[in-house]
Amino acid sequence: MDRLPTRVDRGSADWHGRREYNLGLADQLKEYLAAVKNGGGGKYVERHRKRGKMLPRERIAEICDPGSPFLEFSSLAANGLYDGRAHSAGIVTGIGVVHGKECLFVANDATVKGGSYYPMTVKKHIRAQDISDANNLPCIYLVDSGGAFLPMQDEVFPDIGHFGRIFRNQAVLSGKGIPQVAAVLGSCTAGGAYVPAMSDESIIVKGNGTIFLAGPPLVKAATGEEVSAEDLGGADVHTRQSGVADHFAENEEEALRMVRNVVENLNIEPKQRL
């Protein structure tokens, strides 16, 4: 193969100046990416781990085939927005390989404002579903979310491309035969509760996993009744009584293995060998 000649003078001051400038930008990008991978950082990550929970990218890595690639979308979403409090818009999305099958992941980051949805979070979630639709990819939702970020709810709910579109998309994708699989790994409150409820198969973790539209404090305020989160919407309630969830997991590791088992038994063929 012929080599393409270049007229760039690598010895010129201009070339060295441009090189240093672009290397600086590359270093800046690395710093940004390192920051977002730490989620909410500091005490929020520590508190998250004390509850026996993994970070979202760790959860995805546990589900994906060992050594397989993961293509993450929009790592820098919401960069510079919301006073810098919402790294990656509080959600990790991308394509991973599970039992040789390409799957679309949507994983809430509970270290970022409890996994609540900012306007950019909604946009990123819907974009991931659009990619699933266009490429016929099963969706895996790793749910750990308090629903909409209430101080900005006027920017989250009202429009056609806002929060409600997520649930509409789940119904449409399921109707097209694109599997919707959810693992409830933390609190799923308000809007966050609809994702596992509308999935084709859902898994919930004992202790950490809860599904309800309103948590115990709101129940007490509205009715005067005192109830624990586990009794109100825990794993036992939803697998043995309500039927909202299909599989009971003793811990997070077991839940992630169950996700792999569900995908293994999906009646779909791998798109290509990766």
Where are the model-predicted features located?
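Amphipathic alpha-helical segments at domain termini/boundaries
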Residues: M1-L76, L213-L274
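Long, structured ligand/cofactor-binding scaffold of large enzymes
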Residues: E46-V181
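Conserved catalytic cores of soluble enzyme domains
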Residues: V143-K271
